[in-house]
């Protein structure tokens, strides 16, 4: 167990950038991902509370004015990832995608609070985080459940967190791909293509983004 903890710390710290952490330390995911940051923050909370709070605060810094927290924040604009910041062409203070991901930040923050004794040094940070999370949840209620059905909608497989699931095969098969659609993928060059979505799937993802 001790070796496992040690190697886990090494991975987190090895992927760390200024204020945020990459999901993988290669070109596969060269940005800050919404719910990845939540789990990363939870990991940091076991040995470095400041890093955990920095991770979440940086994510909330990319929050849109209407309350949405995007699923990607592009802090480094020089990447081969597609679709990149120029394709999405949105974001407020930080370049971002135009969709979101499952709102796990509230659960993550609660777990961190339960685990750590919070002194005055971090109270202001937690207040800022909770304020951002509340605004985020209100956004989901207003824009993703406008009829008050109690069911929040998602608009893209990437918002689900399980975009490679066969559950998407039938609905996504109805997406009409433009004949002039052109782009260059990099994800299937970094890792084994067998572990990545098929080109036809990616074409559909990009079409409806």
Regions found by a protein language model. Give the residues of each.
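Low-complexity, Ser/Thr/Pro/Gly-enriched N-terminal "stalk/linker" regions
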Residues: 1-32, 53-54, 58, 72, ...
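Solvent-exposed loop and edge beta-strand segments that line ligand/cofactor-binding
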Residues: 20-38, 42-46, 83-102
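Extended ligand-binding clefts on enzyme/binding-domain cores
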Residues: 137-209
């Amino acid at each position: 167990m001790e070796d496992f903890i040690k190697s886990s710390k090494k991975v987190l710290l090895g992927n760390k950038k200024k204020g945020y952490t990459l999901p993988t330390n290669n070109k596969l995911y060269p940005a800050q991902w919404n719910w990845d940051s939540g789990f990363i923050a939870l990991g940091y909370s076991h040995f470095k509370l400041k890093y955990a709070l920095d991770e979440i605060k940086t994510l909330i810094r990319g929050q849109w004015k209407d309350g949405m927290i995007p699923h990607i924040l592009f802090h480094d604009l020089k990447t081969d990832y597609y679709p990149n910041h120029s394709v999405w062409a949105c974001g407020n203070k930080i370049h971002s995608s135009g969709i979101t991901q499952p709102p796990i930040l509230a659960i993550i923050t609660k777990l961190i609070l339960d685990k750590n004794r919070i002194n005055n040094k971090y109270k202001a940070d937690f207040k800022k985080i909770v304020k951002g999370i509340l605004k985020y949840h209100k956004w989901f209620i207003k824009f993703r459940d406008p009829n008050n059905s109690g069911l929040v909608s998602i608009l893209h497989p990437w918002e689900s967190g399980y975009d490679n699931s066969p559950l998407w095969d039938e609905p996504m098969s109805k997406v009409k791909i433009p004949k002039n659609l052109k782009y260059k993928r990099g994800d299937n060059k970094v890792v084994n293509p067998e572990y990545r979505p098929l080109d036809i799937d990616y074409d559909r993802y990009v079409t409806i983004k």
